[in-house]
């Protein structure tokens, strides 16, 4: 099956045809490091980590860059409020971000470029845009002239005259068009700044990604990812800068993940309804958070709640219990390779359908639970290899069930619930042999079942 991705630029699911099959290029917008990241910031990291893993499975060389924005007005304000140096603040929160994402089992990208390490490249790119007539100086600033690009707005599908409503666009008298955006801004003596042909100043937000992509990945790249909220103006402006500076296309496939909602509202710092990743990690294992983020399609909104997290933990308990087995010691088959037509691979090749991939994991776990002893090594290896594409099942099963309310046989409450649900379904399917097997298994573990009209109750 061919890898197919929903391309925001074309508005449809496109076959992925790389520029160079021997060097796949992927760029994802990273954090602005002035605070700890919330779970909404983590969603694109986890989503595109799955894409990175999939691309590594399909191609010999994948170059993945995810930037760090370490110069921004929010950073300047936060450092001033805290009474600390900007570099101290950004280094602290850069490390905190790395630690949090490691807890979610996100792979480290090939390249992690920092904005402040690329000021010369930004200045050079701005100079090219000025020279080509796509940018101009005004009121001490350098701005991109959106009217100089005939197809400006092609990513968001907005017309120039309509795109200001509801967008993060500053309207000012010194602009030729209200949609013109800042490439370079002046700095006061108290603010960080760098010397440039337009005076001492600092870059605008949008130019950072374009300059870093050009340096590390090239004029045109395969895939650019980020949150849905970045489509306009950030990614629209990236396209304008990249295309106009280099006279080429910029990105061939644009991918955007959906919002995370809390109680039906988009989670955001402005609404005060955000949940920090590190706070959630005090209550849940990082793999539980990851599983929850992958429980729905990446382009769909995800209503984040305690129920979603509890269901994620139960789902993982079911998978880990299949690996744990029933007391037998079974090692995964050595050297197992996931076949190219495996259901998990096929699901991910279909625009990263992680929910379908997770369902396929549960199907393997179900087979593993029913398998004869001789068949278990291969099934266990298959489950681990398939889960690795999703960044899941990285903990030893016995360790997973530690620090939970578990029976002497290693069964947590959630694992027991999962087995009871499986037994109920087996009875509905008239698979009475499996239903009896589960009852016997739970009885051996000291769990008593009581079938009632309301359902099955269990007790230790």
UniProtKB/Swiss-Prot annotation:
Cofactor names: Zn(2+)
EC number(s) per entry: 6.1.1.16
Cellular component GO terms held in the UniProt record: cytosol
SMART domains per the UniProt record, alphabetical: DALR_2 (SM00840)
Keyword hit for Protease: no
GO biological process entries: cysteinyl-tRNA aminoacylation
Chief place of localization: cytoplasm
Binding of Zn(2+), residues: 29, 209, 234, 238
InterPro entries hit by this protein: Cys-tRNA-ligase, Cys-tRNA-synt_Ia_DALR, Cys-tRNA/MSH_ligase, CysS_C, Rossmann-like_a/b/a_fold, tRNA-synt_1_cat_dom, tRNAsynth_Ia_anticodon-bd
Catalysis performed (reactions): tRNA(Cys) + L-cysteine + ATP = L-cysteinyl-tRNA(Cys) + AMP + diphosphate
A GO molecular function held by the record: cysteine-tRNA ligase activity
Subcellular location: Cytoplasm
Subunit structure: Monomer.
HAMAP family, per database record: Cys_tRNA_synth (MF_00041)
PANTHER family according to UniProt: CYSTEINE--TRNA LIGASE, CYTOPLASMIC (PTHR10890:SF3), CYSTEINYL-TRNA SYNTHETASE (PTHR10890)
Designated name of the protein: Cysteine--tRNA ligase
Organism: Alcanivorax borkumensis (strain ATCC 700651 / DSM 11573 / NCIMB 13689 / SK2)
Classification of source organism: Bacteria, Pseudomonadati, Pseudomonadota, Gammaproteobacteria, Oceanospirillales
């Amino acid at each position: 099956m061919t890898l197919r991705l929903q391309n925001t630029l074309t508005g449809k699911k496109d076959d992925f045809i790389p520029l160079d099959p021997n060097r796949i290029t992927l760029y994802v917008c990273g954090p602005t490091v002035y605070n700890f990241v919330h779970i909404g910031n983590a969603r694109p990291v986890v989503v595109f980590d799955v894409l990175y893993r999939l691309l590594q499975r399909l191609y010999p060389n994948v170059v993945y860059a995810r930037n760090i924005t370490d110069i921004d007005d929010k950073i300047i304000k936060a450092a001033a409020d805290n009474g600390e140096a900007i570099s101290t603040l950004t280094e602290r929160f850069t490390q905190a971000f790395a630690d949090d994402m490691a807890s979610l089992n996100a792979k480290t990208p090939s390249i992690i470029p920092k904005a402040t390490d690329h000021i010369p490249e930004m200045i050079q790119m701005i100079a090219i845009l000025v020279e080509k007539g796509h940018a101009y100086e005004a009121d001490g600033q350098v701005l991109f002239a959106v009217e100089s690009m005939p197809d400006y707005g092609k990513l968001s599908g907005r017309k120039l005259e309509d795109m200001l409503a509801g967008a993060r666009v500053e309207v000012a008298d010194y602009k030729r068009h209200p949609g013109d955006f800042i490439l370079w801004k002046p700095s006061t003596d108290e603010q960080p700044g760098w010397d440039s042909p337009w005076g001492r100043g600092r870059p605008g937000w949008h130019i950072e990604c374009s300059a870093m992509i050009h340096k590390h990945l090239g004029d045109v790249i395969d895939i650019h990812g980020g949150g849905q909220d970045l489509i306009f103006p950030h990614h629209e402006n990236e396209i304008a800068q990249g295309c106009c500076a280099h006279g080429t296309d910029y990105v061939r496939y644009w991918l955007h993940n959906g919002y995370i909602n809390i109680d039906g509202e988009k989670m955001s710092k402005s609404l005060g309804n955000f949940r920090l990743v590190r706070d959630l990690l005090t209550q849940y294992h990082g793999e539980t958070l990851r599983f929850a983020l992958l429980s729905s399609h990446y382009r769909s909104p995800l209503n984040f709640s305690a129920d979603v997290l509890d269901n994620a933990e139960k789902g993982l308990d079911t998978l880990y219990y299949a690996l744990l087995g029933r007391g037998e010691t079974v090692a995964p088959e050595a050297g197992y390779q996931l076949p190219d037509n495996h259901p998990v691979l096929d699901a991910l090749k279909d625009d990263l359908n992680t929910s379908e991939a997770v369902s396929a994991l549960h199907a393997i776990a179900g087979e593993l639970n029913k398998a004869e002893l001789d068949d278990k090594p291969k099934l266990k290896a298959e489950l681990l290899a398939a889960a690795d594409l999703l960044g899941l099942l990285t903990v030893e099963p016995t360790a997973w069930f530690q620090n939970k309310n578990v029976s002497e046989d290693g069964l947590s409450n959630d694992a027991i619930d999962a087995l009871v649900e499986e037994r109920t379904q087996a009875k509905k399917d008239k698979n009475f042999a499996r239903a009896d097997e589960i009852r016997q298994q739970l009885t051996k573990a000291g769990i008593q079942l009581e079938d009632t009209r309301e359902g099955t109750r269990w007790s230790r």
